[in-house]
Amino acid sequence: MSGLKYGLMVTGPAYGTQQASSAYQFAQALINSGHHLVSVFFYREGVLNANQLTTPANDEFDLVRAWQQLANEHAVILNVCVAAALRRGITDQHEAEQLNLAAANLQPGFTLSGLGALAEAALTCDRMVQF
């Protein structure tokens, strides 16, 4: 069986747990196996994967930019739960202006969205996998 459409939900931060890095490795493996990764929904602490200000040490894997590159190369939609993101200090330019915040820090390639994006992925993908 090949060519399935997948959606992922990532609930772990970019650093500190294995959830996000395992999700990224899974994403790479399923794409390399001929499947289609439609979207990734970052929820709870997973929204920290979209923080543009994350700066890993030189000898560490840059997971934030790796997600961005994966999205660019394979047309993967990177959705970030807007409510969870705002609670954790992550915002795009529009929300920053609406809330009178000093700056935005959402990594390019990621999009703030609601739970509707997760529901849509669950309805349209053959498989949803949570990390």
Curated annotation (Swiss-Prot):
Q: Which domain of life is it from?
A: Bacteria
Q: What is its main location?
A: cytoplasm
Which principal EC class is assigned to this enzyme? Answer: transferase
Q: Which SUPFAM superfamilies match?
A: DsrEFH-like (SSF75169)
| Keyword terms, alphabetized | Cytoplasm, Transferase, tRNA processing
Q: Name one Pfam family in it.
A: DsrE
Supply one GO molecular-function term. sulfur carrier activity
UniProt EC number: 2.8.1.-
An individual GO BP term: tRNA wobble position uridine thiolation
Q: Which InterPro entries match?
A: DsrEFH-like, Sulphur_relay_DsrE/F-like, Sulphur_relay_TusD/DsrE
Q: Name one GO cellular component term.
A: sulfurtransferase complex
List the catalytic residues. Answer: 81 (cysteine persulfide intermediate)
**Compartments in which it is found:** Cytoplasm
Q: Which family does it belong to?
A: Belongs to the DsrE/TusD family.
Entry-linked NCBIfam families: PRK00207.1 (NF001237), sulf_tusD_dsrE (TIGR03012)
Instruction: Name the HAMAP family for this protein.
Output: Thiourid_synth_D
Q: What does this protein do?
A: Part of a sulfur-relay system required for 2-thiolation of 5-methylaminomethyl-2-thiouridine (mnm(5)s(2)U) at tRNA wobble positions. Accepts sulfur from TusA and transfers it in turn to TusE.
Listed under subunit, the entry gives:
Heterohexamer, formed by a dimer of trimers. The hexameric TusBCD complex contains 2 copies each of TusB, TusC and TusD. The TusBCD complex interacts with TusE.
UniProt-recorded name of the protein: Sulfurtransferase TusD
Organism encoding this protein = Yersinia enterocolitica serotype O:8 / biotype 1B (strain NCTC 13174 / 8081)
